[in-house]
């Protein structure tokens, strides 16, 4: 019974500290289905309870309480009363695991180690997961409880000293001390662990320290995460097998969280809240665990597992919750994602890494950052979309919303964020910079960025620019978000955007040159750019688009007559956009113009035909530009290059035109003959070179114009984009309110095809020609 007494003392102590108001936890643990695994041991516990051993337990508990009062006073003065119960229950449990007295002792002793050496403790914590798995496997059901309790005690600063005292208590046998020593030795990171840490590229101390601080901070999230890990481990019996070896160490992990002090019980208890995230954790952690498992020196496995789990959770959980939080996963977002140990970010809901949009909303920025690092590799590996995603990720990192698309977002959070912040705050700057940085994601980034929430379907694209729009411009965000629904098209247009990447790269100078204009455009440039675009849309919201399919020129002609509309748009949008239009129009005009066109089209059809031409260019820039180039706008088929060029030239000319009042029109019309001819020439060349792409771009773009025109479903990809546009429309409408009726739909649809590679070349030329106009 001495062994039992010592165990009871330790266990009762652990519950006292760990219970911290969770005295019912042991019962919960038992009730939570631990009994089945404890049946045998529980039977023993009952025997012990009925046997004089229980008296010993009471005595030991009293002794413990005496000691406990000292420590509990430090942790929680009220524990002594509550502790008795947990102690009894724990003692019962301990008696249950009486078969493993040494294990229980070791576990009890281990927690101090966990508390003292964060790296070693972390290693033990990782092993505690294994230990918990063992309880799950039924290897040491009693021990798991003991371990969780110990963990909880470890969480409490006083508990460690209390453990030490317990160790010094005569009830604690030397056996326990020996086990403790062994555990301590095990805890020391082994060369293998260090190697694993190096390989993982994460400092074991950091994760360990993070985990430990979480435990010290009584980070419930970490316990949840740990529970997830434990569950993952439990699910992965490989770890469970190796766990048995690490039984003593497993105690430390529970120390992370008080509530989770009962690894198994807490598992069921925590599972309630982190069950979903645990499921994710399991899949993620399990996936990672196999990796960490190979080097399974108990301590090493812990480090490897923890690092791996953290890495996996970082990628998965971090992307879901907080990419940046992974390091502190438990600390920064403890409450948000308790389930996720690696990244207990505020989004436990996003169990699936990419799918859950909720995660991005809370603190996707950090997640994006972290995720971008961890996920960027996988996301980028995935496809160009991954690249786009990277951009999106970066923007998402900056933007909480993009979170759902953590994988894609994460890849380029830095890029997108930098573009947002770097080039211009303006949407165009964001679009341009993100697109430029991630050429394929220029419009794509901008579009997806705009609807972090709506664009979940297009995670990669959305991810690319969600952050950008948010940062850059709320209205633009609405447009972008509205465009994001266009992400549907964007998915189709993504390729186009990839082509556009080149154009974006070329276009970047414009945005840089017109960074001021871009900023203004972001504020007003959207309106300014869209005035031209809006004009065409206004001209024939629905018909022009479909008409553009066959005869963009004719519509353009009417739109030119509607030049008067441009003023309306400008008035509506605050004409300041002339200068901004040049830079912003290129990137933002396509998107903003479409929406503005839609809104303004509805609002006004007075703006100058130049604006209308610009919009038409946006709608059918390729055709129209080509027509201008070939002097037969109607004959020219809408082509991405021409369209893009027209749009780009319109954008670059927008400033001059808005200044001249006819920049876009002159592009298409002789008014700004020099600009128009050169632009058309470039566009024509680019269109001719990339004529095949032009249709795509024009299609991608037309959907926006179609939407702006009211025939969103006109284009092939438009129906879905139209739906998205509607959804986003409502979503963007609120955000796009500043722009009035601006139809985000048009925005969404426009961007993707706006910048085909040919268009990029033409646009680049155009930009070079007019990039300095602003």
Curated annotation (Swiss-Prot):
Segments of this protein annotated with the region Disordered: 257-279, 310-365, 386-421, 442-473, 525-609, 656-678, 755-774
Listed PANTHER family: CG1 PROTEIN/F18 (PTHR15275), MASTERMIND-LIKE DOMAIN-CONTAINING PROTEIN 1 (PTHR15275:SF1)
Name of this chain's protein: Mastermind-like domain-containing protein 1
Gene Ontology CC terms: centrosome; Golgi apparatus; nuclear body; nucleoplasm
Extent of Pro residues compositional bias: 331-361
Function summary: Transactivates the HES3 promoter independently of NOTCH proteins. HES3 is a non-canonical NOTCH target gene which lacks binding sites for RBPJ.
Expression triggers: By NR5A1.
Disease: Hypospadias 2, X-linked: A common malformation in which the urethra opens on the ventral side of the penis, due to developmental arrest of urethral fusion. The opening can be located glandular, penile, or even more posterior in the scrotum or perineum. Hypospadias is a feature of several syndromic disorders, including the androgen insensitivity syndrome and Opitz syndrome.
BP term (GO), one: regulation of transcription by RNA polymerase II
Similarity-based family: Belongs to the mastermind family.
Major location (coarse): nucleus
Location within or outside the cell: Nucleus
Ranges of compositional bias, category Low complexity: 574-609
Keywords: Activator, Nucleus, Phosphoprotein, Transcription, Transcription regulation
Tree of life domain: Eukaryota
Tissue expression remark: Expressed in fetal brain, fetal ovary and fetal testis. Expressed in adult brain, ovary, skin, testis, uterus. Highly expressed in skeletal muscle.
Modified residues (Phosphoserine): 676
Compositionally skewed regions (Polar residues) per UniProt: 386-397, 656-669
